[in-house]
A protein has these predicted regions:
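Metal-dependent nuclease catalytic regions and adjoining charged, substrate-binding loops involved
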Residues: 159-161, 171, 175-286
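Short, well-structured alpha-helical interface segments that form or flank functional binding sites
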Residues: 92, 96, 125, 164-171, ...
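Residue-level recognition of conserved beta-strand positions in structured domain cores
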Residues: 139-141, 185
């Protein structure tokens, strides 16, 4: 375990499984209020499109994606209807997780007012999830794949952080004058949870990146942050290039790469080859 609170939380949940736990009415009401607020926010906000602006929740993203959000938001891929339930699952997980922390006797603080980070271009605001032992933590719900791979450690998260989670945490910590803690991650597939500490985070470097992002967005200059990757088969390059992993979840990937072709893997010999996003194809057959 990576955090002292994990043991206390596991003990409380074990008692709950065995019918030995209790929960206060205050905690039940707090969970209910948090979920109610989430339902109102997700389903009752009317138009979801808001005027673009840098926030703690987006400033860690690649600048090419932010450029599209600012200049061509209409070109984003439409969200599937499952998106709403997925967002609600995350909100419910966070609400219940905080309730479990409370009942497990783990002291924490919540952010009731937005914190502000001063950058060269102005101020960026946001609201962090919680603080334990003087360190800012974020609560994330993740798919089984992300739980096992992306959130395996700080290093794996930092290496493929297309959602900007590391920069976001650094921004919250800097703005609040607290330490950067890490991420409480809950697996949406099976309920497993763990703590991923940001033990190798370079705060000065991350805040400098946020400042650079703000300057780039203000200059309104478009430049791709990721290059196509060389496709390989059995350890050898095929001569083709494919979409960079950093672009896979971007809502603007089709606009950014207008010549991209999605088709079954060219070199694969499987009966049902996986679908690959090709940027350039120089060899049709292997």
């Amino acid at each position: 375990m990576n955090h002292p609170a994990e043991l206390a939380l596991h003990k409380y949940l074990a008692d709950a499984v065995n019918g030995k736990s209790t929960i206060s009415e205050a905690t039940i009401e707090r969970i209910g209020k948090d979920v109610t607020d989430a339902v109102r926010r997700q389903f009752g906000s009317g138009s979801k499109r808001k005027e673009f602006g840098l926030r703690m929740s987006n400033i860690g993203k690649p600048t090419c994606q932010l450029w599209f959000e600012k200049n061509k938001p209409e070109e984003a891929l439409p969200k599937p209807t499952t998106f709403m339930f997925n967002m609600m699952l995350g909100d419910i997980v966070e609400a219940v997780f905080k309730g479990a922390l409370t009942e497990a006797g783990i002291a924490f603080e919540e952010c009731h007012e937005p914190v502000s980070l001063k950058l060269d271009t102005g101020t960026v605001k946001g609201t962090y999830d919680l603080v334990i032992d003087g360190a800012v933590d974020d609560v994330k719900s993740a798919s089984d794949w992300s739980y096992r791979n992306k959130f395996e450690s700080f290093d794996t998260l930092h290496k493929g952080d297309s959602f900007g989670y590391v920069g976001q945490l650094a921004g919250y910590a800097k703005a609040s004058g607290k330490k950067a803690g890490g991420w409480w991650v809950v697996n949406k597939a099976n309920g497993a949870f763990k703590y991923v500490p940001a033990n190798n985070i370079n705060m000065d470097e991350e805040v400098a990146k946020l400042n650079s992002t703000a300057l780039t967005v203000e200059a309104n200059e478009f430049k791709r942050c990721f290059k196509p990757e060389i496709e390989t088969f059995r350890g050898h390059p095929t001569g083709n290039t494919v979409l960079n992993n950093g672009c896979i979840f971007c809502d603007f990937r089709y606009s950014c790469w207008p010549n991209m072709v999605e088709r079954p893997s060219i070199p694969s010999q499987a009966k049902e080859p996986k679908i690959v996003s090709y940027i350039t194809i120089s060899r049709e057959h292997m």
